Amino acid sequence: MTALSAAPLRAQVGYDPPSSPYRDLRQTQELTFFSGYFRAKADPARVAPQSGPIFGALYQWRPSGPMHLNVSVSRVSSERRVLDPDLPGTCSGVPAGDCKLIDTFQWPLYFIDGGLALALTGARSFYHLVPEVKLGAGVATDFHSQADVGQFQFGTRFAFNWGAGIRWVPGGAFQVRADLSNHLYAVKYPGTYYVPAPDKSVIFTNTQSQTAWLNNPSITIGISYLFSR
């Protein structure tokens, strides 16, 4: 009698499918439109594109299991300072250190990224949530092919990216996702920043490296359309 009663008890271990917190993810692809804020790190000369709102689109595909492939395009509504190394180092009526500043200009910054994302709950959600970690690479560009008056050019440069996110998948064809990301890229200063002006002032002395690596975090929220082939 005891042996017969043990079998149904063993069958009850775990969750009944209707009450389980796990749900299989049926769709394998998503198209997300997102917006948020890009927090640019100030470079030593403060001439790189600055912080601003960011928006863009993300395509993500899950070929199998927890692994995802993704590609995204985004735009930052940024500004950038333009310096003239030939201007005098001392002046009146402007903040200290800004005597060589010509002006601050609207300067949009664009990212084209590709990478991998790993869903920590596998090919399913946990209480409708899917946490992710991601890693990738791409380019950052301002689409300017010529240097400014001070010979500085941001141009197009290689950028690493990584971060984490969480997806809320309530069921159906839509989801909401939030992501915390970081872009790492370098800016390079021209030789003119180290050449004395007529008054012997310089933007940089030789102790400042010509290359500065910048970490630039961003936080975004997006709405996704989910689908499969």
Predicted features, each with a name:
Residues 58-149, 157, 170, 216-229:
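Gram-negative (and chloroplast) outer-membrane scaffold detector with strong preference
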Residues 33-37, 71-75, 133-141, 166, ...:
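Transmembrane beta-barrel strands of outer-membrane/channel proteins
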